[in-house]
Amino acid sequence: LDAHRLRADSDAILVGAGTVRSDDPSLTVRLPGDERDERDTEPLRVVLGAAPADAAVRPCVEHSGDLGDLLDDLGARGVLQLMVEGGPTVARSFHEAGLVDRYVLYVAPAFFGGDDAAGMFAGPGVPSIDGLWRGRIVDVARVGDDLRLEIED
């Protein structure tokens, strides 16, 4: 429910074509009726790359190319807050381009992994602790059994 509130507060939601192919998300806002009445519009749906024709999501915008150009285009459409829900490749692209104002991460008391498990960012890791990106935690909240961390640069 918390993530759907974040969606509702956003002007647009972005995922990559890989997420569309693997998860087939609808990218809709699903809130209880009383909360839904306060937020009567759905965010624009943005897909980096091309969504398959049979995908559940019906993107308002499909984009391939420079992320800065995409943000300019979305700004011209009135998008002031973009929620990036992409997988590791999209997350890395936005992070490396310095286009993230705030990270919202959920930590659950559950573990999974393995040699082929996807990490938060695609690509090679940092060679040493000196190469780590360090953000600043601006909020921590308990959401059911999980924790939500808000981190800024």
Give names to the regions the model predicted.
Residues 1-153:
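Enzymes that bind and transform nitrogen-containing heteroaromatic metabolites
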